[in-house]
Amino acid sequence: MPKIDKPLAQKVDERVFEQLLKYNPQTQNLWDIVGIFENERQKLRIEIAQYHEDIKNSQAKLKELREGITKAQNILRAIEQKISESPVPPEKEESQKEALMLKISELELENSKLLVELRDLKSEYQLEENLHQMQNMRETLQESLEDPSKP
């Protein structure tokens, strides 16, 4: 059975919990706990910035690939139109059909790649949303640690 990665939120929770278990109230103060959360928050900010950059790059690449597909489809349509307008001997018609089928297969493969990339972008977006929610929870926890009089 393949190993399933833990969600990022669970990994972060485990790291923080492990650090909190090492907290010694006799030798450390509460600011050390705040430092732990600040450190985790900074790591999350860096990861989120990297996710944003990756998403921008992926979107640019996706746009570029879509433009390439559109150009290829336009070329294919133009070729199909030329073929339909010109009389073709039967032996050439078969080779042209094979060429068109090959081009169609290539376009379908490219479309499949784009669908996978789109799925990956959606997953990255969902991960980013989860990270944002986690960051908000951490900030709320930090605020409550800084000012315990707030509910």
Curated annotation (Swiss-Prot):
This is Uncharacterized protein HH_0809. It comes from the Bacteria. Residues 35-147 form a coiled coil. Keywords: Coiled coil. It comes from Helicobacter hepaticus (strain ATCC 51449 / 3B1). Disruption phenotype: Strains missing this gene make normal amounts of hydrogenase and urease; addition of Ni(2+) to cell cultures caused a reduction in the amount of the enzymes produced.
